[in-house]
């Protein structure tokens, strides 16, 4: 089922980490999760021109830390940091706790799945041919180090009356391999004919030694006592010549040879 399941959820705690990293009890969990969704929607609308790839939200000790990954950090920060201060004050009103905002730059936006999907949807809204937009994005990703990429578009492509799905793939995209670093994202293009959905899978190699992969400590397995164990512990190893012989053999003195067809008694 690797072809159908969400690639990020399939790899959580194995080779990918969560986008919301906090703990809450049952009473507060739903409210905090809804708050995270609202913050992400607000940032997506507010920073539409800043090429935001993903947003990581952490909640340590009655405050919040939000990390914004963007290929254009200057647009997020603004002149002399004015825009980021306004953004921080708005986020504090929404979340009700002190908020620290960090900006991380995406070095290769051509290999980031979310930025690729957003770029394709923007081109579709400008009436650019979907095949040209998809193939150009695939060429740029492969040129800058991606080992494989797959792009799927679905909807009324080129304004046709019957919706259809088209996809292209270049390189390897191993969806069943858990250690494979698969970057997955979706986006929607709102055209005059309706919505066109775009999905992007980018294979960047294996996640051995990746920084954001969760580290699982291996605990040494303790030897559990068996039920009805011997009081003195396990049986000591058997030495040669002691208690040997095939199963069912009689122990003690060797059996005397009897007469032919007799009952084992010798004649007197």
UniProtKB/Swiss-Prot annotation:
Keywords on this record? Ribonucleoprotein, Ribosomal protein, RNA-binding, rRNA-binding
Question: Can you give the residue ranges of the KH type-2 domain?
Answer: 39-107
Give me the stretches of Low complexity compositional bias.
248-257
Using the UniProt annotation, give all residue ranges assigned to the region (Disordered): 216-268
Q: Which GO terms describe its molecular function?
A: mRNA binding; rRNA binding; structural constituent of ribosome
Q: Where is the composition biased (Gly residues)?
A: 258-268
Q: Which GO terms describe its biological process?
A: translation
Kindly list the residue ranges recorded as spanning the membrane.
none
Q: Which GO terms describe its cellular component?
A: cytosolic small ribosomal subunit
What residue spans carry the Basic and acidic residues bias annotation? 232-242
InterPro entries documented for this protein: KH_dom, KH_dom-like_a/b, KH_dom_type_2, KH_sf_prok-type, Ribosomal_S3_C_sf, Ribosomal_uS3_bac-typ, Ribosomal_uS3_C, Ribosomal_uS3_CS
Top-rank lineage group of the source organism: Bacteria
Q: Which PROSITE patterns does the UniProt record give? A: KH_TYPE_2, RIBOSOMAL_S3
PANTHER family (UniProt xref): 30S/40S RIBOSOMAL PROTEIN S3, SMALL RIBOSOMAL SUBUNIT PROTEIN US3C
Q: Self-association or partners: how does it assemble? A: Part of the 30S ribosomal subunit. Forms a tight complex with proteins S10 and S14.
Described by its record, this protein's role is as follows:
Binds the lower part of the 30S subunit head. Binds mRNA in the 70S ribosome, positioning it for translation.
The UniProt entry's sequence similarity note says: Belongs to the universal ribosomal protein uS3 family.
Name the chain's protein. Answer: Small ribosomal subunit protein uS3
